[in-house]
């Protein structure tokens, strides 16, 4: 059973966000998601400057088992991507909530954050799977 950090917000599609000091949000996939996918072999990220829309696919995580679309938890402009994943996609497996982050978004509508789940709500999603 993986631990779900209480300081993050979650999408039911297994992405997490963390607010940063500059007002942007870091996006990644949860420990649970990486466990389901297995060993990562490739991560396709959006481009810096791209606009992402909440609920729409914007990245792909490929593992030895499957390729899975990654959905934007909130809308906004991509301001950074985790270039380390290009050479080391396994960071998603070893540190899903840390060094395995995918990209950062400057939100266009911060109220979308309110629609995301807290740790308890996300645990309920996992329990219902």
From Swiss-Prot:
- Give the matching InterPro entries: 2-oxoA_DH_lipoyl-BS (IPR003016), Biotin_lipoyl (IPR000089), GCV_H (IPR002930), GCV_H/Fam206 (IPR033753), GCV_H_sub (IPR017453), Single_hybrid_motif (IPR011053)
Record Pfam families: GCV_H
Q: Which residues form a coiled coil?
A: none
Give the GO terms filed under biological process for this record: glycine decarboxylation via glycine cleavage system
Q: What are the residue boundaries of the Lipoyl-binding domain, all occurrences included? A: 24-106
- Could you list this entry's UniProt keywords, alphabetically sorted: Lipoyl
Cofactor names from the entry are: (R)-lipoate
Protein's UniProt keywords contain Repeat = no
Is the Transferase keyword given for this protein? no
Which domain of life does the protein's organism represent? Bacteria
Q: How is the cofactor bound?
A: Binds 1 lipoyl cofactor covalently.
Q: Which GO terms describe its cellular component?
A: cytosol; glycine cleavage complex
Show the CDD domains listed in the entry: GCS_H
- Its biological function? The glycine cleavage system catalyzes the degradation of glycine. The H protein shuttles the methylamine group of glycine from the P protein to the T protein.
Q: What interactions and quaternary structure are annotated?
A: The glycine cleavage system is composed of four proteins: P, T, L and H.
What family classification does the UniProt entry report for this protein? Belongs to the GcvH family.
What's the protein name? Glycine cleavage system H protein
Organism of derivation: Shewanella frigidimarina (strain NCIMB 400)
Lineage, uppermost ranks: Bacteria, Pseudomonadati, Pseudomonadota, Gammaproteobacteria, Alteromonadales
């Amino acid at each position: 059973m993986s631990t779900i950090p209480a300081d993050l917000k979650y999408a039911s599609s297994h992405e997490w966000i963390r607010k940063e000091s500059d007002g942007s949000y870091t996006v990644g996939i949860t420990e649970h998601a990486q466990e389901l996918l297995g060993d990562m072999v490739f991560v396709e990220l959006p481009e810096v400057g791209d606009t992402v829309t909440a609920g729409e696919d914007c990245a792909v995580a490929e593992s030895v088992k499957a390729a899975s679309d990654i959905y934007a938890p909130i809308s906004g402009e991509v301001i950074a991507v985790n270039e380390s994943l290009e050479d080391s996609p396994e960071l998603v497996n070893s540190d899903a909530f840390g060094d395995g982050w995918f990209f950062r978004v400057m939100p266009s509508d911060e109220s979308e954050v309110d629609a995301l789940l807290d740790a308890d709500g996300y645990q309920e999603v996992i329990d219902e799977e």
